[in-house]
Regions:
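Short active-site-adjacent structural elements
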Residues: 15, 144, 172-179
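Active-site glycine-rich loop that binds ribose-phosphate moieties when present
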Residues: 144, 148-150
Length: 235
């Protein structure tokens, strides 16, 4: 049975009335893309609830693809984030009034986690369909980065793998005007929609090709389970 694609966005923050990631995510509500139903969830912009909310969503939705979207004012194109770091450092308060300075996302967690998106395929598909986009090697140290870090941690032992990524999106034109359009690029909602639709259309066939091989790997792993932290004896 086909699983779902989970797409998330964030509510407005910092006094803004809209958030481009929320607008983009909501535009996909109820859609069927490449045979997969798209499930949409909007997150409060609060650092303390990210882990708990994603943990709950993964159980409720049971997706095999998760795309978290986050607004990144100042960017001029869609940005796929390659890496999330175990750092929380931001001075713009979240919607609970919280800031972070030199903190970590997860105590004892890995320094960084790498997204398993097929980056080159997606960017090539974007460019072929006229969507400006690129791969970013820095998701920052705010809540967007935290989202990707938490998601990768929550899904790292899933078999078959859950394909997980963070998409940073620019301001919408109205936001850029309010912020001072001479120094704040923007992108139309229609172009953002084309971008995330193309992203999903590119990922789903790739996921379906990977699933049989991932299942074989999982079955092979059951033949000899080695607890984490225990090395196999050299032969």
């Amino acid at each position: 049975m086909a699983k779902h694609v989970l797409v998330t966005g964030f509510e407005p923050f910092g006094g803004d009335k809209i958030n481009s990631s929320e607008m983009l995510a909501r535009s996909l509500e109820g859609r069927l893309i490449s045979g997969r139903s798209v499930m949409v969830r909007i997150l409060p912009f609060e650092t303390r609830t990210v882990h708990e909310r994603f943990e709950q969503m993964l159980v409720e939705v049971d997706p095999d693809v998760v795309i978290s979207t986050a607004q990144a004012g100042g960017r001029s194109a869609l940005a796929l984030e390659r890496v999330a770091v175990n750092v929380l450092d931001f001075d713009t308060p979240d919607n609970a009034g919280i800031t972070r300075t030199g903190d970590v996302v997860a105590r004892g967690g890995a320094d960084a986690r790498i997204s398993n998106l097929p980056f080159d395929r997606i960017v090539n598909a974007w460019h072929e369909s006229g969507v400006p986009g690129y791969v970013s090697n820095s998701a920052g140290t705010a809540i967007g980065n935290q989202t990707l870090y938490e998601l990768l941690g929550l899904t790292e032992t899933a078999a078959p793998p859950v394909i997980t990524g963070l998409l940073h999106v620019p301001y919408l034109p109205a936001q850029a005007i309010n912020a001072g359009s001479e120094s704040n690029p923007s992108m139309s909602l229609d172009l953002m929609k084309r971008g995330i639709e193309t992203l999903i259309e590119t990922i789903v066939p790739w996921v379906e090709q990977r699933t049989p091989e991932a299942t074989k790997t999982r079955e092979a792993g059951r033949q000899m389970w080695i607890p984490r932290g225990v090395k196999e004896v050299e032969r």
